[in-house]
Amino acid sequence: MAAKIKKNDQVIVLIGKDKGKIGIVRKVIAKSKVIVEGVNIVKKHTKPSPSQNKKGGIVEQESSINISNIAILNPTTKKSDRIGFRVKNGKKVRFFKSNNTICN
């Protein structure tokens, strides 16, 4: 099955502590998890590494979120939407189901 959500898609969070936040997908992990820019920020404790000249401390970074907890944002309606597939000129393209516009 083709990926309905891809890198650089604008998405909205549906469930969780960041519900309602909008961000851009930075990475898709194994078709079940994604990393969204500015969403699900966690604090990671790192040890100092003198060989790599890295200081230790607490670093904030984005953690993965399940793909079922996000939805793609339709730029024309500014609301969450579902994605469908169709063949156009011999190529498989994604489209928004609410208004049948082609997704980039």
Curated annotation (Swiss-Prot):
GO-annotated molecular function: rRNA binding; structural constituent of ribosome
InterPro entries registered for this protein in UniProt: Rib_uL2_dom2 (IPR014722), Ribosomal_uL24 (IPR003256), Ribosomal_uL24_CS (IPR005825), Ribosomal_uL24_KOW (IPR041988), Translation_prot_SH3-like_sf (IPR008991)
GO BP annotation list: translation
Pfam families xrefs: ribosomal_L24 (PF17136)
Single GO cellular component term: ribosome
Membrane-spanning residues: none
Organism superkingdom: Bacteria
Annotated keywords: Ribonucleoprotein, Ribosomal protein, RNA-binding, rRNA-binding
Signal peptide from the UniProt entry: none
Family from the record: Belongs to the universal ribosomal protein uL24 family.
Subunit structure: Part of the 50S ribosomal subunit.
Physiological role: One of two assembly initiator proteins, it binds directly to the 5'-end of the 23S rRNA, where it nucleates assembly of the 50S subunit. One of the proteins that surrounds the polypeptide exit tunnel on the outside of the subunit.
HAMAP family: Ribosomal_uL24_B (MF_01326_B)
NCBIfam families: rplX_bact
Protein name as it appears in the record: Large ribosomal subunit protein uL24
Species of origin: Buchnera aphidicola subsp. Baizongia pistaciae (strain Bp)
